[in-house]
Structures are given as structure tokens and as C-alpha cells.
UniProtKB/Swiss-Prot annotation:
It comes from Desulforamulus reducens (strain ATCC BAA-1160 / DSM 100696 / MI-1). Homodimer. Belongs to the UPF0210 family. The lineage of its organism: Bacteria, Bacillati, Bacillota, Clostridia, Eubacteriales. This is UPF0210 protein Dred_1672. Pfam families: DUF711. HAMAP family: UPF0210. InterPro entries: UPF0210.
């Protein structure tokens, strides 16, 4: 039995500390939707998504009412479209994205992920077509998200793909110049991408996954901050233990909701992603958790150590609360989506270089960072390459979701609204890296990849 104190504590977390389920994401396999005729394949994709996810939003709303826990987003991830579309006669995969968008709109989800390709070791014909289609697809759809995996610890980094993605990010920004480059906010470049990630924009349904599955992403920076403030002045062991216990409680709630959703929908439960995911709302910030640990401002010296402690304690607590942990599982640092990070970047303390250092110890990478619109494709590729190298060498997922905001320069800001928030334009290095990123080929896998 639960004690009255535990019940009241959970109510307080929801009402006062912004505790919520960030997303219930249904993963759907589209491998049986392939067809030589592109139009038929698109129709099959639409039909399968609208059939499998017909009751997803309804189930989420019922669980919200039953348990009193806010579920912010209901989303869908699908098999990487490069795999499904490759057998078709299409030389542009935008119609596949449009079919996904229509299906997402029909079932009422706010995002659908999986306009994706896995090219860490090289390209197939379908991979090239999909990557070439990304700018148009993201500019002409509302709910579709795209991701491309360009590196892994086992295979090294496909630098041809890195350079091409620098160009694609630039094209995405230019196609949505009237919206501050919004298409870039729906595109992620990965190293060591997880196949069961419930969070956007990097979600897709991996080829080793079941026909259909429910994955859950939790959110609780406000809860962790409140707990950290209660142990002010204690030693690091006490601090870590406090975060660990708090993460346990948050993850338990995620597991409960995920299993309830899976049961209602008649599909298997997949994983809980332990990630602390901030929002632009006051009191829902990862940066403020780090500041509660004793930093004057997120981004100052000591930030990386504080984030390492936070990330590790979240994983340890969450792993005890669920048998099935997956996705990214750690602390997110999306600049435009975190009120504390926005503030730190505006005063110049949180820089691109510091964010890169922080990605060495957190769950993902350079996320939702706005940079000057005149940044070249080669510089974008070099930024991506740096981040991929961190992931490759350290056996971890890293990613880049970066926005070269058209017509904007340092001192300006971009406004996306909603969960995507807003961000100041931060500077990049002016020295180029064109000769390096255009060498071509693969950066070999590191020696530590030889594990067998």
C-alpha cells in the first residue's frame, strides 16, 4: 500500500513542480508497406498508421483522467522511410512524408518521426533519395520529423554523410526562412542512434522492434530541482542519492502510464526513457537544477561536472524503477527549450563550446541551438563532425539539431513558440574547416570498438 504522504507528494509534483509524462510514442513497423508503386506504398503507410494509432490519443486522454497525470504529447514513430520507400519507383520521397503528415493529422498526434536514414557506413540508393528529399519534405509538412545516423562506435563516421547533412541543414533553413528556419528544428543528425527513442525529432521505429510498441518519455526537471534545493550544503554523496531517489519516483510513474497505455491499446510495452526533458516554462529547466547544485549560472566552470553527476544519478534511480529502460535516458540540454539555458546564453556565459563539453556527459548532444544565418554548410558539417566524434569515441549517443537562422546574426533571436521555445543567436568560430570536411570517406572506428 502507498502511504498518504506518497500520494500527496505525487500530487504536489504534478501541481507545483511541472511533473508530467512528456510523450507516449507508438512505434509502428511499416516494413510490410513497401511497394514498387510509390503511390500504393504511400496509401499503405497512411492506412496502417491510421489503423494502428486510431485510439492512441483517446487512450492517452483516458489515462490522464484516470490517474490525474498530465500527458503532454501523443506521438508516432515509424520504420525509417529510406528502407520502406527504396523498393518503389520514386526519385523523391516527399510524397511519403506527406502521407505520414496526413496520417498524423488524422489520428491527432502532434509529431510523427521516422523520415529517416541510417548511413553510418555508407549510402544505398534509397538513403540518398531520402536525404535529398529532407528539405522539401520538412518545409511542406507540419508534423513530420527527420533523423539521419551518420556514425557509430562500431563503424566510425561517414564523413560524406556529415558533409551532405551540413548542406541539408542549410537548405532546410533557407526553405523556411520566413519561420526562422523552423524545418531545422525537425531534423536531427545522430551518432549511435537508439532505435526505441520516444522523443522528437529523433524518434524512429527500429528494425529490431516488434510490429507495434508503446514507448514513454518522462519529464521532471522541476521535481529534481525542488529535491536538490532541500539538500543545500550537503556533500556530493547526499546530493547524488537525492537525485537518484527522485528519478526513481519519476520513472515509476512513467512505467505505470506506459503499461496502462499498452494494455488499453493491446500492444506490447517497450521502454521508459529516463531523460529529464525541460520546457520553456519557468521551473521546468535542467539548467536551474545545475544552478541549484551551487553554480551561479549554467555554463560557468563546474557545469560539466554538475551535469555528469545529474545524468548518472538519474540513470541509477531510473534503472531501479523499471526493467525496461531505453531511448536516450539522461538529461537533455536543448537550448531553446530551457528557460535557464536561454538566460545563460543571453548573458554570454553558456557558449557553443561549453555546450559541446556538456554533451560528453549528458544523454544527447547539441540541441536546438540557433546560430547566425550566414554560417556555411562546411562549418555546419564541422560542428556535426565534432559532435559525432564525441559519441563515437565514448560509446554514447550524440546528436546535432542546429538552426542557422536566415537573416539573423549574433544578438538577434529566433521564436518558434510552444515546446520549441525561443533562443538567442550564439556565435560560431570564424575560421573555416572546408578542406577537412570535404576530404571524403570514413573516419575509422576507434580501437575501443573492438570488443569481441
Amino acid at each position: 500500500m502507498y502511504s498518504i504522504n506518497e500520494v500527496l507528494e505525487t500530487i504536489r509534483m504534478v501541481q507545483e513542480e511541472n511533473l508530467d509524462i512528456r510523450t507516449i510514442t507508438m512505434g509502428i513497423s511499416l516494413r510490410d508497406c513497401a511497394d514498387a508503386n510509390a503511390a500504393k506504398a504511400c496509401q499503405r503507410i497512411y492506412d496502417k498508421i491510421t489503423t494502428q494509432a486510431a485510439n492512441l490519443v483517446k487512450a492517452g486522454e483516458e489515462i490522464e483522467r484516470e490517474y490525474g497525470i498530465p500527458i503532454i504529447n501523443k506521438r508516432i514513430s515509424v520504420t525509417p522511410i529510406s528502407l520502406v520507400a527504396e523498393s518503389s519507383d520514386a526519385n523523391n520521397y516527399t510524397p511519403f512524408a506527406e502521407a505520414m503528415d496526413r496520417a498524423a493529422k488524422e489520428v491527432g498526434v502532434n509529431f510523427i518521426g521516422g523520415f529517416s536514414a541510417l548511413v553510418h557506413k555508407g549510402f544505398t540508393k534509397g538513403d540518398r533519395i531520402l536525404i535529398n528529399s529532407i528539405p522539401e519534405a520538412l518545409a511542406t509538412t507540419e508534423r513530420v520529423c527527420s533523423s539521419v545516423n551518420v556514425g557509430s562506435t562500431k563503424d566510425g563516421i561517414n564523413m560524406d554523410a556529415v558533409y551532405r547533412m551540413g548542406q541539408v541543414v542549410k537548405e532546410c533553413a533557407e526553405r523556411t526562412a520566413d519561420k526562422d528556419g523552423l524545418a531545422c528544428a525537425k531534423l536531427v543528425v545522430f551518432c549511435n542512434v537508439p532505435e526505441d527513442n520516444p522523443f522528437m525529432a529523433g524518434a524512429f521505429h527500429g528494425i529490431g522492434e516488434a510490429e507495434c510498441v508503446i514507448n514513454v518519455g518522462v519529464s521532471g526537471p522541476g521535481v529534481v530541482k525542488n529535491a536538490v534545493e532541500k539538500v543545500k550544503g550537503t556533500d556530493f554523496g547526499t546530493l547524488a542519492e537525492t537525485v537518484k531517489k527522485t528519478a526513481f519516483k519519476i520513472t515509476r510513474m512513467g512505467e505505470l502510464v506506459g503499461r496502462a497505455a499498452a494494455k488499453k491499446l493491446g500492444v506490447p510495452f517497450g521502454i521508459v526513457d529516463l531523460s529529464l526533458a525541460p520546457t520553456p516554462a519557468v521551473g521546468d529547466s535542467v539548467a536551474e537544477v545545475l544552478e541549484a547544485m551551487g553554480l551561479e549560472c549554467c555554463g560557468t566552470h563546474g557545469t560539466t561536472a554538475a551535469l555528469a553527476l545529474l545524468n548518472d544519478a538519474v540513470k541509477k534511480g531510473g534503472a531501479m524503477a523499471s526493467s525496461y529502460v531505453g531511448g536516450l535516458s539522461g538529461a537533455f540540454i536543448p537550448l531553446s527549450e530551457d528557460a535557464g539555458m536561454i538566460r545563460a546564453a543571453e548573458c554570454g556565459i553558456l557558449t557553443l563550446e561549453k555546450l559541446e563539453a556538456m554533451t560528453c556527459v549528458c544523454s544527447v548532444g547539441l540541441d536546438m541551438i540557433a546560430i547566425p544565418g550566414d554560417t556555411t554548410a562546411e562549418t555546419l558539417a564541422a560542428i556535426i563532425a565534432d559532435e559525432m566524434a564525441i559519441g563515437m569515441v565514448n560509446f554514447k549517443t550524440t546528436a546535432v539539431r542546429i538552426i542557422p537562422a536566415p537573416g539573423k546574426t549574433v544578438g538577434d533571436r529566433v521564436e518558434f513558440g510552444g515546446l520549441l521555445g525561443h533562443a538567442p543567436i550564439i556565435p560560431v568560430k570564424q575560421a573555416g574547416a572546408q578542406e577537412f570536411v570535404t576530404r571524403g570517406g570514413r573516419i575509422p572506428a576507434p580501437i575501443q570498438s573492438l570488443k569481441n
